[in-house]
């Protein structure tokens, strides 16, 4: 039984109540009684509106389901379909042109194009690593990944391999030639660096040369000409630091004494309370809120053991350089600018219950997140004894990503919630900024109206292919069987979706004011492929794109040196490359021409993916992890990948492509494979052979067999219920 404290109409879990009063409120000048009275009022006032928005989702889905069922044997008449969506209020009139007016936004969002990390906030070590990933070693990123092939004697090995190291150095020199070229010759020919009359000079066998664009020299550290110093360069607003130490192990092997090239990498990071975490009760939520508080105060730390040594990981300090003329000082952020992703409007959490007559109802988690992540983020706006040594925003803003909103009314509700939270916290109106995830179909087709609803708060829009595909399938569940998962990336609607997001953002004045973002690279070990392919996102006009690790952030940062995103956006400005009809094109299989082995392959692939993710979520509370696929390729999985896999199989089941027996047989085939892939985890509990005793196995089965009944195809209700069962069992056994 949860120990609770009464606060007006609310009964708050003591663990949350004590955290707020003892840890979060001190240093904010907010009176505890006033705060809890404010929380009570916000929850009481906004809960009915939240419920109404969810009822509207269900109402629209029921109307769409009925429309498709009445026409299931007919080819889709796109004009009739569009008119129907207008008639029921799903597709809304497009607003007149407007420009966003958001103010007080940090440069990392308005002007600097670069990678964006997303990391589960419940894991302090991951969170610290991500916050510190503002700067990363290019040498380490190249040496430790498949960007440098392990051929011709260039294997990684257990100790430093000079052959591989030389290839790393050559690759980095080629990068410098493209990002900060010399006025003649190549960085590969460099034999030394110096600063003369405030200008960088690079010595070569043919004499000394400067940069082709001298203004790209931004500063230096250390004593000029000393054995250990560095040179700071800048290109497209991103910094490059060349570390020079001829006496270091790597510097000894380099003609110019260069020991590393460090890139400004994860310019922004999203600390995630949503799809990458498993937070089902007050204890889980407080763990996340406490880590978010520590990040904002700057005092979060974690004991880390590595290579037999233990050390304390803390947040990095800012970086200071001498200006090129030797007279001034330049300070650059040492940490990523932090967003926090709250949960969406759907789920409730028993961390707080609301008394409603004789009933007690769990409070909407999205309302709680806005209140408590907003409160704890106040400490990131100032420094002092009670607020910690570091700041997050330098412009007085708190950046909240809001996911899974369906249409402009839900965006407007979030803005109303943020305004009410600002009143409770005594913050100026407009302090809480919103990042809009364009990952639900009703938001995509009404994106301009969604942005207008948040025109004075919006700081980013972002496409999310996986969740968006999950909603695409669920919205049109009754229309017929969908194409295979791997074919989704080549559909008409996907290209239209990605292009429209950029076009609409630019038309609303995002250039120089807000981020336009694109999705995650999930194949964590395939960095060579990422370096080859992910450049397409800045080329498409995106000022940021998601990466799964600090190493990936450093490698992806190169793309923003190769591509001038600002110039791309100028080229795209004023263009409208898509139609609403393209966005509404449903990815139906034109004919069911799959061979039995193709169907089995698709079912097995999806069942393995579902089991591999769900077993860690339900049994261990791990919301984001590298999950090997059926071919043992490590993929970064979260609830978005689960949603698309489960919804596709639910769709095939609904239309008779597969049977319940096929699903069960595949799950039973794949469970031993997943068990084997987790064999090295001492805490892992196998699903086979007692499948029906495994709550994780049953959760995976539920997600598929009841997938058509899940609200908008979301996986959270089943995951939360099964995870709570696991925790209850553990509590009983203790």
Curated annotation (Swiss-Prot):
Top enzyme category: transferase
Residue positions binding acetyl-CoA: 118, 125-126, 276, 313, 548
EC number annotated for this UniProt entry: 2.3.3.9
Cofactor list: Mg(2+)
Biological process according to GO: glyoxylate catabolic process; glyoxylate cycle; tricarboxylic acid cycle
Catalytic reactions on record: glyoxylate + acetyl-CoA + H2O = (S)-malate + CoA + H(+)
Residues involved in Mg(2+) binding: 439, 467
Entry annotation: catalytic residues: 341 (proton acceptor), 638 (proton donor)
Any Pfam family matching the protein: MS_TIM-barrel
GO CC term (a single one): cytosol
Positions of glyoxylate binding: 341, 439, 464-467
Modified positions (Cysteine sulfenic acid (-SOH)) in chain numbering: 624
UniProt cross-references to SUPFAM superfamilies, sorted A to Z: Malate synthase G
GO molecular function, one term: magnesium ion binding
Alphabetic keyword roster: Cytoplasm, Glyoxylate bypass, Magnesium, Metal-binding, Oxidation, Transferase, Tricarboxylic acid cycle
Listed CDD domains: malate_synt_G
Subunit structure: Monomer.
PANTHER family: MALATE SYNTHASE G (PTHR42739:SF1)
HAMAP family reported in the protein's UniProt record: Malate_synth_G
Protein family according to the UniProt entry: Belongs to the malate synthase family. GlcB subfamily.
NCBIfam families: malate_syn_G, PRK02999.1
Known role: Involved in the glycolate utilization. Catalyzes the condensation and subsequent hydrolysis of acetyl-coenzyme A (acetyl-CoA) and glyoxylate to form malate and CoA.
Name of protein: Malate synthase G
Gene: glcB
């Amino acid at each position: 039984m949860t120990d609770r404290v009464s606060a007006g109409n609310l009964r708050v879990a003591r663990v949350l109540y004590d955290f707020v009063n003892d840890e979060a409120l001190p240093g904010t000048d907010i009176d505890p009684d006033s705060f809890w009275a404010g929380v009570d009022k916000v929850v009481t006032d906004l809960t009915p509106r939240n419920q109404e928005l969810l009822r509207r989702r269900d109402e629209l889905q029921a109307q769409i389901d009925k429309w498709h069922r009445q026409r299931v044997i007919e080819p889709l008449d796109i004009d009739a379909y569009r008119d129907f969506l207008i008639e029921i209020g799903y597709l809304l009139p497009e607003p007149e042109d407007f420009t966003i007016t958001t103010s007080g936004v940090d440069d990392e969002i308005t002007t600097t194009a670069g990678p964006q990390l997303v990391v589960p906030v419940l894991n302090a070590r991951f969170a610290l690593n991500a916050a510190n990933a503002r700067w990363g070693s290019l040498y380490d990123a190249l040496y430790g990944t498949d960007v440098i092939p392990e051929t011709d004697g260039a294997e990684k090995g257990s100790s430093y391999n000079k052959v591989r190291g030389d290839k790393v150095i050559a690759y980095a020199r080629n990068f410098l030639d493209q990002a900060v070229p010399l006025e003649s010759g190549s960085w590969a020919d460099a034999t030394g660096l110096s600063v003369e009359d405030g200008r960088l000079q690079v010595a070569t066998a043919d004499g000394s040369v400067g940069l082709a664009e001298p203004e790209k020299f931004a500063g230096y550290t250390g004593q000029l000409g000393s054995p250990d110093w560095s040179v700071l360069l800048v290109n497209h607003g991103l910094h490059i630091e060349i570390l020079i130490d001829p006496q270091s192990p790597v510097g000894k092997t380099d003609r110019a004494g260069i020991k590393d090239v460090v890139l400004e990498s994860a310019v922004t990071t999203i600390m995630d309370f949503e799809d990458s975490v498993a937070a089902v009760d007050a204890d889980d939520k407080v763990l996340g809120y406490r880590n978010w508080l520590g990040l904002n105060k700057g005092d979060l730390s974690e004991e880390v053991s590595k290579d037999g040594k233990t050390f304390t990981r803390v947040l990095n300090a800012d970086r200071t350089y001498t200006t090129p003329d030797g007279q001034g000082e330049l300070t650059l952020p040492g940490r990523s600018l932090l967003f926090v992703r709250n949960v969406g409007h759907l789920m409730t959490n028993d961390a707080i219950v609301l008394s409603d007559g004789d009933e007690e109802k769990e409070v909407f988690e999205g309302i709680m997140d806005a209140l408590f992540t907003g409160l704890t983020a106040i400490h990131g706006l100032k420094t002092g004894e009670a607020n910690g040594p570091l700041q997050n925003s330098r412009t007085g803003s708190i950046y909240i990503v809001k996911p899974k909103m369906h249409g402009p009314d839900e965006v407007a509700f979030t803005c109303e919630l943020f305004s009410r939270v600002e009143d409770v916290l005594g913050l100026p109106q407009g302090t809480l900024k919103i990042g809009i995830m364009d990952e639900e179909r009703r938001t995509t087709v009404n994106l301009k109206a969604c942005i207008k609803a948040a025109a004075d708060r919006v700081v980013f829009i972002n496409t999310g292919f996986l969740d968006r595909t999950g909603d695409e399938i669920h919205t049109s569940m009754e229309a017929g069987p969908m194409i295979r998962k791997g074919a989704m990336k080549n559909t008409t609607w996907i290209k239209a979706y990605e292009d429209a997001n950029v076009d609409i953002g630019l038309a609303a004045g995002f250039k120089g004011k807000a981020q336009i973002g694109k999705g995650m690279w999930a194949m964590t070990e395939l960095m060579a492929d990422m370096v080859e392919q992910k450049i397409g996102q800045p080329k498409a006009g995106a000022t940021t794109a998601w990466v799964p690790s600090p190493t990936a952030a450093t490698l992806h940062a190169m793309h923003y040196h190769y591509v001038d995103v600002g110039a791309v956006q100028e080229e795209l400005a004023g263009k409208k490359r898509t139609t609403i009809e393209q966005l509404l094109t449903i990815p139906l299989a034109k004919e069911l021409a799959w061979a039995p082995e193709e169907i089995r392959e698709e079912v097995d692939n999806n069942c393995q993916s579902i089991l591999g993710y769900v077993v860690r979520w339900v049994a261990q509370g791990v919301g984001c992890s590298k999950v090997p696929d059926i071919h043992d390729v490590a993929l970064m999985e979260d609830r978005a990948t689960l949603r698309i896999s489960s919804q596709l199989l639910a769709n095939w089941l609904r239309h008779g492509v597969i049977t319940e027996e096929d699903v069960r047989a595949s799950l039973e085939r794949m469970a031993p494979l997943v068990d084997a892939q987790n064999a090295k985890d001492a805490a892992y509990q196998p699903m086979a052979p007692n499948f029906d005793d495994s709550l994780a196995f049953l959760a995976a089965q539920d997600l598929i067999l009841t997938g058509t009944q899940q609200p908008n195809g979301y996986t959270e209700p089943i995951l939360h219920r099964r995870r709570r069962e696991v925790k209850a069992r553990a509590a009983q056994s203790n």
